[in-house]
Amino acid sequence: MLLRPNSGNTLKYGCLLTKRWLTTSKLLYSVEDMKIKIGQEQYRKALEERIDKIPIENYRNFSIVAHVDHGKSTLSDRLLEMTGVIKPGSKSQVLDKLDVERERGITVKAQTVSMFYNDGKQDYLLHLVDTPGHVDFRAEVSRSYASCGGALLLVDASQGVQAQTVANFYLAYSMGLKLIPIINKIDLDSANIPGAREQIETTFELDPNECIPVSAKTGLNVEQIIPSVIKNIPSPVCDVNKPLRALLVDSWHDPYVGVVMLVHIVDGRMKKGMKILSAHTNRTYDVKEVGIMYPDRTPTSFIKAGQVAYIIPGMKNPREALVGDTFYQMGKHEGLEPLPGFEEPKPMVFVGAFPADGKEFNAMDDQMQNLVLNDRSVTLEQETSNALGLGWRLGFLGSLHASVFKERLEKEYGAKIILTAPTVPYKIIYKNGEEKIVTNPDDFPDNQKHHDVESYMEPYVEAIMTVPNEYVGNVMTLCLNNRGEQKEIEYLTTGQVLLKYEIPTSQLVEDFFGKLKGCTKGYASLDYEEAGYRKSDIVKMQLCVNGEPQDALTTVIHRSQAQARGKEYVTRFKKFLSYQLFEVAIQAKINNKVVARETIKAKRKDVTQRLHAADISRYKKLLERQKEGKKQMKLSGRVTIKNDAYQAFLRRED
């Protein structure tokens, strides 16, 4: 039986570092209360003593699988309140550290928090690993799942199973995680609990009787979750007596202490002062600090097998922190195998980035480098554009990743930036057997080099969409217009349909999700995963103004879309160009062949306004001279295009 603060019993350090909701609704001491009551140093010792006494059999590592806006962060907050990690009513979305995560309601970086729970008989140490739900951050998701024994499968009672839920379920299931179905938002008038149970049974083949209906917002039934976690999720398979092996789950850069790494200790122990070795870079580091997230960094003397904790390794360059890497203790690593799952992040969307004001390049370069320090999945190279000047070629995991990066740059540094249209990595196979990946449309082979190429290949994704039944026809038409191929259709309930299509990645990054939302009145959801490369008839299209290619507007498209896309480009770009004293031709070209053209007529001065009406010969002479002058001007004149025109075009303004 847990002691309450007002009972007459003696308070023993380490016994009351938790609280849980009781039938009387009286709470035990929270983390903040205990720090104040017994002091920081005694609190730390009590914490270490408590951790050391808990056997690994009483550890539970779990995650939450959910679609965006199904209440994952709110449920996390309730669990933290229930276990005394935070006070009730404190700031929401505790695990979302970045401003952009709070504002968008998404998780970008994997986070963890440790929780203590006592069932009245014994202590348990729980690690909740909060993972990004979006496919762009799938590397963090898979590494996080690797450190868990199970997951809560969260489904919105009013919306039912959605695309992201399905995609993350399959990932969790393939990694052997034990899944506990949770139906959230049962307090809503639109909640359909029987319908949600039916979807969980038909889509995931889980027992509907095991579903726990809760309201994360009000806390209703949330107290049933942790006992279910303890009962159903297995303890981690690890051995504290074996040599150290730690899996790197995620990392971030702290301006004061450098790189902070989130690790899952699979075997052994790690403590401050230990020298550790990276399995993949072969670099060594001296551990400056270890501890648990409770909910923020809380230093301890050691961390041991089974824990998901943080370390500060004294790493200077954050790009050395490779997600999925294994760390050993130096001198005790002979014969040890790295933990499975290491994978270098592969950017799938590339954009050109340029400062709105060219004079700001140097200052923005420093800001860009600082932001990349905290996200090693972003690739960064300097490039030069004839149209926009000095800039960068950035590689991202997906279009959401690119959007989040741009938003962070603007909000954290106040930077104004121009992003070119997103492109994907195309594979070119030459006749001599050489293969090349092209990420910049300007580097795509033109007419002169075309004869050396055996074939062109473009990446595809398998898109998973859930839509209301009445919009299925609209979605099928949208997928067909975007060169999609139907793979599967499944009726989840009478009202919801799950569609699987294989779609070119290039079509997906061109606001496919926005179009999907538009044709379903916002009711559709989307997730996707890579589906490899396919041979494709893709071509480079250049936008030329008076014969001069505008490299910032060069794009790679499928030949079947060339004419329609070319017409759209020249018509739209014409709106942003000012009139000149000579005729301006705007052309879309493929292999030097014009596929679309628009013309801006020359500004014309009335040179005959002062002539007498009867002076025909003089009238003709002046018009002829003007015509000749404009001809010369067209040959030698250059069209000056302001940055505003490029910005407006790339923002797709009308």
From Swiss-Prot:
Residues the record lists as binding GTP: 66-73, 130-134, 184-187
SUPFAM superfamilies (alphabetical): EF-G C-terminal domain-like (SSF54980), P-loop containing nucleoside triphosphate hydrolases (SSF52540), Translation proteins (SSF50447)
Keyword Hydrolase: yes
Entry's localization field: Mitochondrion inner membrane
EC class (word): hydrolase
Domain tr-type G: 57-237
Broad class of the protein's primary localization: mitochondrion
Disulphides: none
Keywords of the record: GTP-binding, Hydrolase, Membrane, Mitochondrion, Mitochondrion inner membrane, Nucleotide-binding, Protein biosynthesis
InterPro entries, sorted: EF-4, EFG_III/V, EFG_V-like, EFTu-like_2, G_TR_CS, LepA_C_sf, LepA_CTD, LepA_IV
Function: Promotes mitochondrial protein synthesis. May act as a fidelity factor of the translation reaction, by catalyzing a one-codon backward translocation of tRNAs on improperly translocated ribosomes. Binds to mitochondrial ribosomes in a GTP-dependent manner.
Name this polypeptide is given: Translation factor GUF1, mitochondrial
Organism: Candida albicans (strain SC5314 / ATCC MYA-2876) (Yeast)
Gene: GUF1
